[in-house]
């Protein structure tokens, strides 16, 4: 049986970071990845010469150490000009600061409602939206989008995840954006960076290639008493220290003799899955937006981005591409891929993005984990799981290992911290 000082489960960006920093400290370490390809959510895939990431990925980290790693890769710098589409109208993001394309009646309704917004201490995300934007704006835009992105109504979500992810509304900005078309950047980053070649994974490829990683190694049992991990291929390894970036519900389900209270807490955690609909076009003139949000309820996708706008290396010469993201709650039945493809195809034509003849292919891929969902009291249930794992000396990292709304740089740091602690 193989024996290692440190065993790491999962070779997404957090697991890669943990492995890389363990090796820098001269630890005898091995990272095991269930899939045949490393990278997790920051991995990519190719279809007929087109490259796609697993959903939209752009780096805007301000952390100097992460920059020192990522910046070893030649990158393209983009302005974070995101847009939204709503009933055929393209509005700059965030919508509340860019109401200019709307008719006068809509503008008056939204602005009056903002001025008269309730003063309250929000108990949930719905009340937070009403407090920030007023009933009219909140109900028309972010509340409807919430159901598409999070899979739950806004009142069922807490507010602990928001941070700087949602732009607070200011009356001057709203009025300026209603009276004239504005080019101001109201996003939470001033620059978005993306590798010139190879897709988003290139930011960490150099690290991954230095790491001891075994692919196609799915952990199916963790015996804490004997410090042993068993894999689906029948092999096993012993460890002195165990680091896991596996989703908490998955990890707890494979721990031998995991207490019922902990299992129940882990099973209660919910998340979104993602269906990716990737399209290659036999033309270049698609909407010139890195990414855009989709408010139309009859369009099943919540968001789309253009790999070919992020880098021309992602598409053959003279071609272009889009990828649509359809989110679903983990507790619900999987969506039908054929119906998703048909829905997106119809909406592409309705939006005027292309003709049917200009579509080279429409490809479907399913991601079983997209984002953790912050329903009420999630943190208390999560803490039950984390306290137990800490008591048996299992360290966790990454978006799903810490069960938090981490961006890729935060997941990178999370993996590093499991070794530095």
Question: For the regions a protein language model found, what residue spans apply to each?
Answer:
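N-terminal Rossmann-like FAD-binding beta1-loop-alpha1 element of flavoenzymes
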Residues: 4-31
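Active-site/ligand-binding neighborhood in enzyme catalytic cores
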Residues: 107, 112-227, 238, 245
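Mid-domain catalytic core of redox enzymes
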Residues: 25, 218-322, 326-338, 346-352, ...
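Glycine-rich FAD pyrophosphate-binding loop
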Residues: 23-46
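Dinucleotide-binding Rossmann-like beta1-alpha1 core, especially the glycine-rich loop
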Residues: 48-120
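Conserved flavin/dinucleotide-binding core of flavoenzymes
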Residues: 44, 309-421
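Short loop/edge segments at beta-strand edges and connector loops
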Residues: 77-79, 215-218, 398
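Conserved Rossmann-like nucleotide-cofactor binding loop
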Residues: 14, 37, 249
């Amino acid at each position: 049986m193989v024996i290692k000082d440190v065993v790491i489960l999962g070779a997404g960006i957090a697991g890669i970071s943990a492995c890389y920093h363990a090796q820098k400290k001269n630890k005898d370490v091995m990272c095991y990845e269930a899939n045949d390809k490393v990278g997790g959510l920051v991995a990519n895939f190719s279809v007929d010469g087109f490259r796609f990431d697993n959903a939209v990925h752009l780096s805007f980290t301000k952390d100097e150490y992460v920059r020192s790693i990522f910046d070893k890769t030649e990158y393209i710098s983009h302005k974070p000009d995101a847009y939204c589409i709503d009933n055929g109208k393209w509005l700059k993001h965030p919508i509340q600061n860019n109401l200019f394309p709307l008719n006068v009646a809509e503008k008056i309704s939204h602005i009056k409602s903002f001025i008269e917004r309730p003063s309250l201490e929000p108990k949930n995300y719905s009340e937070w939206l009403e407090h920030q934007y007023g009933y009219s704006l909140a109900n028309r835009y972010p509340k409807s989008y919430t159901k598409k992105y999070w899979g739950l109504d806004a009142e069922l979500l807490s507010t602990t995840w928001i941070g700087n992810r949602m732009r607070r509304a200011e009356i001057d900005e709203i009025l300026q954006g209603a009276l004239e078309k504005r080019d101001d950047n109201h996003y939470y980053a001033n620059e978005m960076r993306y590798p010139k070649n190879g897709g988003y994974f290139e930011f960490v490829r150099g690290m991954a290639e230095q790491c001891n990683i075994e692919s196609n190694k799915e952990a199916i049992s963790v015996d804490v008493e004997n410090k042993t991990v068993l894999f689906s291929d029948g092999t096993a390894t012993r460890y002195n220290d165990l680091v896991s970036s596996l989703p908490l519900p998955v990890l707890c389900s494979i721990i031998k003799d995991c207490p019922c209270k902990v299992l129940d807490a882990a099973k209660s955690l919910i998340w979104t899955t993602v269906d990716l609909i990737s399209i290659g076009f036999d033309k270049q003139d698609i909407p010139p937006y890195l990414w855009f949000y989709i408010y139309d309820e009859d369009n099943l996708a919540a968001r789309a981005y253009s790999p070919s706008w992020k880098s021309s290396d992602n598409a053959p010469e003279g071609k272009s591409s889009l990828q649509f993201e359809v989110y679903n709650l983990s507790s619900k039945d999987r969506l039908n891929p054929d119906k998703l493809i048909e829905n997106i195809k119809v909406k592409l034509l309705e939006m005027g993005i292309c003709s049917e003849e200009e579509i080279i292919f429409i490809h479907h891929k399913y991601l079983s984990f997209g984002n953790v969902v912050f329903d009420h009291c999630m943190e208390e249930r999560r803490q039950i799981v984390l306290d137990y794992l800490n008591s048996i000396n299992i360290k966790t990292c990454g978006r799903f290992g810490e069960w938090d709304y981490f961006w890729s740089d935060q997941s990178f740091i999370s993996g590093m911290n499991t070794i530095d602690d």
